[in-house]
Amino acid sequence: MFLMNMLCLIIPILLAMAFLTLVERKILGYMQLRKGPNIVGPYGLLQPIADAIKLFIKEPLRPLTSSKLMFTLAPMLAFSLALSMWIPMPMPHPLIHLNLGVLFILALSSLAVYSILWSGWASNSKYALIGALRAVAQTISYEVTLAIILLSTMMMNGSFTLSTLTTTQEHMWLIFPLWPLAMMWFISTLAETNRAPFDLTEGESELVSGFNVEYAAGPFALFFMAEYTNIIMMKALTTTLFLGALHNPLLPELFTANFVTKTLALTMAFLWIRASYPRFRYDQLMHLLWKSFLPLTLALCMLHVSLPTVSAGIPPHM
């Protein structure tokens, strides 16, 4: 039974990830006044399946000088971590009810750094190593702000359990009282998932394609799948944290439809940003975090910690 539950979680995620690649190519196409994929199947709907078949039947090449074990393990670790992050997500019921679901997600997203580092180091290529070091520095840096924003949000929630956020946001979405945090969270998730305009790790003019430059076929597909699964996961987490889900006692069936609609809208905003903005310079990226986001999030976190203490003695009618 537990295996069935796992499959019922993993298969829709993989389907969503496959069609997200098509949605991205369509959005980029229409924003550049062209059609995007429209040959394979009606309106190009079978394009992700064709891409998957092409990637998985190719021969996975491995550089002669690379470290065999790490080179093979890195993409597998990346993809398994990307799928594991979905375990505590309430949609509307999580796979496992974790008391500290938020910390679990944070810990796994920190572990994902190792897969990037291993792939860059094991490839034995200077481009891959520089790309990996950039990605690791960027991911670790933005983890700090993500953790502080999560801490402030959990102050409003009262616990680290994601399922209780639905009850917290019955009357009002948390995006309204926490809008500065929500904006910084959105930008930090862009940096966390290495997406434009923060895709410094794969600056084509400098690093060919970043840490996965030596990968081909199946292992490359695993990295690609991990990236897109992470994007959907981050947007699903954003929906849970800030946009609440529709909590209608008369129509509880609408929960999932509502959740999916909001997640899709946020994911399309991600893709829209990719089509609209140029890439940042690396020092600007770090300055944005350490000189702007970190002081702001720390100040707001202190505010959210002190407000309940300060207002504890005020009578309710005031």
UniProtKB/Swiss-Prot annotation:
Top-level class of the enzyme under EC nomenclature: translocase
PROSITE patterns found in the cross-reference section: COMPLEX1_ND1_1, COMPLEX1_ND1_2
Example GO biological process: aerobic respiration
Sorted UniProt keywords: Electron transport, Membrane, Mitochondrion, Mitochondrion inner membrane, NAD, Respiratory chain, Translocase, Transmembrane, Transmembrane helix, Transport, Ubiquinone
EC number: 7.1.1.2
Transmembrane segments: 2-22, 37-57, 69-89, 100-120, 136-156, 171-191, 206-226, 253-273, 294-314
Pfam families given in the database record: NADHdh
Signal peptide start and end residues: none
Its membrane topology: Multi-pass membrane protein
Localization in the cell: Mitochondrion inner membrane
Described purpose of this protein according to its UniProt entry: Core subunit of the mitochondrial membrane respiratory chain NADH dehydrogenase (Complex I) that is believed to belong to the minimal assembly required for catalysis. Complex I functions in the transfer of electrons from NADH to the respiratory chain. The immediate electron acceptor for the enzyme is believed to be ubiquinone.
Family: Belongs to the complex I subunit 1 family.
Protein name, as recorded: NADH-ubiquinone oxidoreductase chain 1
Source species: Tolypeutes matacus (Southern three-banded armadillo)
